[in-house]
Amino acid sequence: MNFIITTRDFSNDDSVLRAAEMRDNVAGSISKAYKGTVRAEGKKKLLLKHLPVPPGGCSRRNSNLFVFCTERDYRKFHQGIAQLKRAPAELDPHEIQQVTASIRCRLQPSLREPPTPADELQTAVSRVCALFNQLVFTAQLRHYCEHQDKVVSYARDELTKRCGEKSALGVEVHQLVALLPHERHRELCHVLIGLLHQTPHMWARSIRLIGHLRHYLQNSFLHLLMNSGLDIAQVFDGCYHSEAYRMLFQIGHTDSVSAALELSHGAAAGPPEADENNDEGEEDDDELRHSDPAPLHESKKPRNARRPRTRVPPHEQKPEENEEEEEELFPSCKATAAFLRAEPSVSNDDGNGGERCDTLATALRHRADEEDGPLASQTAVRVAATPSPSVTPALTPVTSPITPLCI
């Protein structure tokens, strides 16, 4: 006989269950709207319907597309894509997978135990941003490396795995949506769930839409972090503080960044102004009005008064040294490109081909001058400078008549 044991919750407080059901209903209704749209273009238009128009219009194609990343971070991985596009190398897909997995964001996940609701929100936003940046990098691989068959097939499979409700990004998005109050952030929930239903073809072709999404997600996530009471100086890396304060100033959080702006402009500010009720301050102002103006900065002086520039001859110019060397993301592509750029060169066994050739030409010239005169010395130099037939890959036949030498 089979016994079925059932449990029942006898508590009278069911607010938690109602909130969970409401969140599931909201996410389910949004997903149902996208699943009911068959064409990929219709899903894209439905997503654009809930995206506000950015203040600067459409983003540029070469702009930063990573969420909460600096321009240097984005340029590093974008140069890796250009490296794959240039070098026709037999690249292992495992190498691309390692580079993709190393993409993160400058928002740090919370490590506090036990975590508070603000810490859980910070960790969820950080994971969503990192997975979104990895998806953008894979979409750029598919978009720019069209002539690399292996890269195209790898990027197509990765886009299929990374977009969807059952992907890693989909799991993190649903966890983040569960933490948000839907009444206040309904548009953000719609955009987060809507980007999960976009097709791999949309991610590979709509680069400008990715820039639109990046701009909206950054502003919305900053609103969430500031409203939850988190400090920008603690949740972001040090190299991203200035960018975070700039975005906060643009979206209207001027009160939160007033202290940072005062610190940044404190060094450039002049002496403190005198009090309005102080007569000495007024006298100082009168003296300043009647005194001679301060000398102009060198950059603001008239062009005729500037010091003339001295031009350095080309042979005396020093080559510019690169302060930062570009990091190669794919070493195999670098080795292949170096092999293709290599040119055949004439070298001797001792490794000093140039010095040996110069020494031989000098000896033949002196010997010819002593014996037969300057004409023979020119012939000797010409013979010494000619490479040997064993080293030269192909010799062009001489069609001009040979003038005999009279000795």
From Swiss-Prot:
Predominant localisation class: host cell
Cysteine pairs bridged by disulfides in the record: none
Composition skew (Basic residues), residue ranges: 302-312
Compartments (UniProt record): Host nucleus
Protein keywords: Host nucleus
Compositionally biased tracts (Basic and acidic residues): 287-301
Biased composition (Acidic residues): 273-286
Chain positions covered by the region annotation Disordered: 267-330, 388-407
One cellular component (GO) term of this entry: host cell nucleus
Function (record text): Acts as a transcriptional repressor of the US3 gene expression through a specific DNA sequence named the transcriptional repressive element (tre).
Family affiliation: Belongs to the HHV-5 UL34 protein family.
Protein's name in the database: Transcriptional regulator UL34
Gene of this entry: UL34
